[in-house]
Design a protein with these regions (language model features):
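General secondary-structure edge motif
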Residues: 2, 34, 41, 45-49
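Short, charge/polar-rich alpha-helical segments
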Residues: 2-24
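Amphipathic alpha-helical coiled-coil segments
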Residues: 26, 50-74
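A short, structured beta-strand/loop element
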Residues: 25-34
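Long amphipathic alpha-helical coiled-coil segments
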Residues: 4, 38-43, 65-76
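Short, charged, amphipathic alpha-helical segments
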Residues: 13-16, 43-56
Length: 76
C-alpha cells in the first residue's frame, strides 16, 4: 500500500469519526428534548432549531465521508 493510500484511509477514518460524532450529537439532542417533554417542560420546542442544525452537520459529515470514499476509492 502506498503512502498516498494510507493517507486516504486515515482521512476516511477521520471523516467517519466526524460522522459518528455528528450522529451522537443528534441523538443527544433528541434524548434531551424527550426528557424535557417527559418532565413537562412547556418550552421543549427550543430543541427544534438545535436539532435542525445538528442534522445539517450530520448530513455534511455523511457526504464528506461518502464523497471521499468515492473520489479516492478507499475505505475504512
Amino acid at each position: 500500500m502506498s503512502t498516498n493510500q494510507i493517507l486516504h484511509c486515515e482521512t476516511a477514518k477521520r471523516l467517519l469519526d466526524e460522522f459518528g460524532h455528528a450522529i451522537q450529537a443528534v441523538l443527544l439532542l433528541h434524548e434531551q428534548q424527550f426528557q424535557s417533554i417527559v418532565e413537562g417542560d412547556s418550552d421543549a420546542g427550543r430543541f427544534d432549531l438545535l436539532i435542525h442544525e445538528a442534522l445539517e452537520l450530520k448530513q455534511n459529515a455523511k457526504y464528506a465521508y461518502l464523497n471521499h470514499l468515492d473520489s479516492h476509492n478507499c475505505s475504512y
